Amino acid sequence: MPYFVWSHAGRTAGDAAITMSPAASATFPKYRSVDGFGQSLAKHASASAATWVCDRGAAGLEAVTRIFIPSGHNIGAQSVVVASDDNGSFTSPTTLATITTAAGLIENALTSSTERYLRVSIPGAGSAWEYGEMWLGRLRTPSSAVRVEPGWELPPIQNTTVQRFPSGVQGSVVNGGDQRTLKMTLSWVAGTDLTLFQDLAAACGGAKSPLWVGAPDDAVPTTLMWLTAISAWRQDSEFPQATGPTYTVQLELVEALG
């Protein structure tokens, strides 16, 4: 079953709510850790064990259940600790995850937390740590009642134009990055599943903001994407059951490149 993460605690809280220790480098500012683009690096100003803290402004906000640190970071093999607390001093922190990291995309489940303060701690002093995003959000996935229609696709986008001139010379133009698109149709959507896709459309439809998408096949890496269209809100059955109608929803997404 596919899954989606579009909530982003740091982006919602804003740049002023983020504290990096050691402080962020002037040339790699902290806002890049929450801008949602994933590849524009934020960097600590000195080589030291480091923390990234988000003050969400209040407790009881939407839970965080997943963390993403996109590929391109220099964290390497560390034991990164994610914690939350109801006060900024972290006198009684709750550990949400301890992650043995590696190169490439870091994705890990978190113990659900609605506490006000979130902290990511990176040990070691070998480097001034840098990363493209500290994305802590809520994972949402359709229930087992939803059917993913066969034939979903993840093809590369056509990004090259080839021209042949009268002289016989041939030239090509690359239009944008090497991106993939995802087209997926889901049927028997109702109840909380219908709410999920309505929320998704409201938050991300028309490429308003990027989101992480886990494809139906676990072998496909989780990908940061734009939701370009959500359509085909079509009733599945001509004679719906007494519990109410179900719907078919079609998603069209394109890979987001930072």
Locate the predicted segments by residue.
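Extracellular/virion structural assembly segments
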Residues: M1-T51, G57-A63, F68-S79, N87-G88, ...
